[in-house]
UniProtKB/Swiss-Prot annotation:
Cellular component aspect of the GO annotation: succinate-CoA ligase complex (ADP-forming)
MF-aspect GO terms: nucleotide binding; succinate-CoA ligase (ADP-forming) activity; succinate-CoA ligase (GDP-forming) activity
Gene giving rise to this polypeptide: sucD
Name this protein carries in UniProt: Succinate--CoA ligase [ADP-forming] subunit alpha
UniProt xrefs under Pfam families: CoA_binding, Ligase_CoA
Top-level enzyme category: ligase
HAMAP family: Succ_CoA_alpha
PANTHER family for this protein: SUCCINATE--COA LIGASE [ADP_GDP-FORMING] SUBUNIT ALPHA, MITOCHONDRIAL (PTHR11117:SF2), SUCCINYL-COA LIGASE SUBUNIT ALPHA (PTHR11117)
Organism: Rickettsia prowazekii (strain Madrid E)
Catalysed reaction, written as an equation: succinate + ATP + CoA = succinyl-CoA + ADP + phosphate; GTP + succinate + CoA = succinyl-CoA + GDP + phosphate
Record family assignment: Belongs to the succinate/malate CoA ligase alpha subunit family.
Length: 292
């Protein structure tokens, strides 16, 4: 079953004919993703990568039945692209773009309320259900069909968790990069809830980082959840020096809250197993499952 996407998901690409849209659409098609077309305003009626190009998301959905979209659009235009997909009632929208202005994302966040759209990102690697559907920039070959659900604020650390669970023979059910920006569409809580309810997901890896309260919110949810599954977490930034700017816009410790140690403590109190090194994520999960 997995979560969010599967082999039946029909995907369009916004920013389809640009360099990034072209390259990553080629990779998705090669992986087996059911790409059905793309959107580039002004280029409707043409074909690209042997797929139809449309001027609008509305037209693309009407002609192809698409229920998912991936956005490779520059930061100044990305929010409008998300809003267009929301207006077209696309079910899953994955925005890869980094650097979208916060005020633009606040407008998007408001538009998501009561909509039919689930936004993944922005500033994220995307989402993949191994062997079925790849939407985003992650390397497909490191994934393996399995039963570990992975959710992460960091793209490259997601790949570490994937490579290690693949090497351990565990594989993944679905991997979701929720993005590193302060305002995003889908949270740890959203993904953990879906993984807990998914019969194909036996355990969960959650990769967090300093800044914000997403990990604390997840810990509260895990405590209160009636469904229990093994969860391993790594929090990036434990050794981050004070007053130093880090990589993600959301990696800001403010008001004495959002530190890595605070997050570790609250997650441990919820029964989550913490690994202190990203190199031990796969081993920690394998050891935990062997004890059950």
């Amino acid at each position: 079953m997995a979560i969010l996407i599967n082999k039946k998901t029909k995907v369009i690409c916004q920013g389809f004919t640009g360099s990034q849209g072209t390259f990553h659409s080629e990779q998705a098609i090669a992986y087996g993703t059911n790409m059905v077309g793309g959107v580039t305003p002004g280029k409707g009626g043409h074909t690209h990568l042997n797929l139809p190009v449309y001027n609008t998301v509305h037209e693309a959905k009407a002609k192809t039945g698409a229920n998912a979209s991936v956005i490779y659009v520059p930061p100044g235009f990305a929010a409008d692209s998300i809003l267009e997909a929301i207006d077209a009632k696309i079910e899953v929208v994955v925005c890869i773009t980094e650097g979208i202005p916060v005020l633009d994302m606040i407008k998007v966040k408001r538009a998501l309320i009561g909509s039919k759209t689930r936004l993944i990102g922005p500033n994220c690697p995307g989402v993949i259900t191994p062997g079925e559907c790849k939407i985003g920039i992650m390397p497909g070959h490191i994934h393996k069909i399995g039963d570990i659900g992975i959710v992460s604020r960091s793209g490259t650390l997601t790949y570490e968790a994937v490579a290690q669970t693949t090497a351990a023979g565990l594989g993944q059910s679905t991997c979701v990069g929720i993005g590193g920006d302060p305002v995003n569409g889908t949270s740890f809580v959203d993904c953990i809830e879906m993984f807990l309810q998914d019969d194909e997901t036996k355990a969960i890896i959650m990769i967090g980082e300093i800044g914000g309260s997403a990990e604390e919110d997840a810990a509260d949810f895990i405590k209160q959840s009636k469904i229990k599954k093994p969860i391993v977490s790594f929090i990036a930034g434990i050794t981050a020096p004070a007053d130093k700017r880090m990589g993600h816009a959301g990696a800001i410790i403010s008001g004495g809250k959002g530190s890595a140690e605070d997050k570790v403590e609250v997650l441990q109190s919820a029964g989550v197993i913490i690994t202190r090194s990203p190199a031990d994520i796969g081993k920690t999960m394998l050891d935990l499952l062997n004890k059950i």
